[in-house]
């Protein structure tokens, strides 16, 4: 799965809206929207917060991390 699909799946497994997930990982709603739309890639701070969210909610973080490492926003380098 691609990073946008992985992050959306993690959010939906906890039955959260994009807004609620954004609050959990300490970013703006629009940021989560851009991640899921493939228009942005989380920075290291955001990835740390996503990892903490996954650990707290018993979600496999490794697939998200792998997808993040392989993901590049169109028009930008990895």
Can you describe what each PLM-predicted range is?
Residues 5-20, 49:
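Short basic helix-loop element that most often maps to the first helix and adjoining turn
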Residues 6, 31-34, 46:
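Residue-level recognition of specific faces of alpha-helices
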Residues 8, 12, 26, 37-39:
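Residue-level detection of the helix-turn-helix DNA-binding "recognition helix"
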Residues 15-34:
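Short alpha-helical DNA-recognition segment
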Residues 44, 61-78:
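Short, charged recognition helix plus adjacent turn
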Residues 45-63:
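DNA major-groove recognition helix of helix-turn-helix/homeodomain DNA-binding modules
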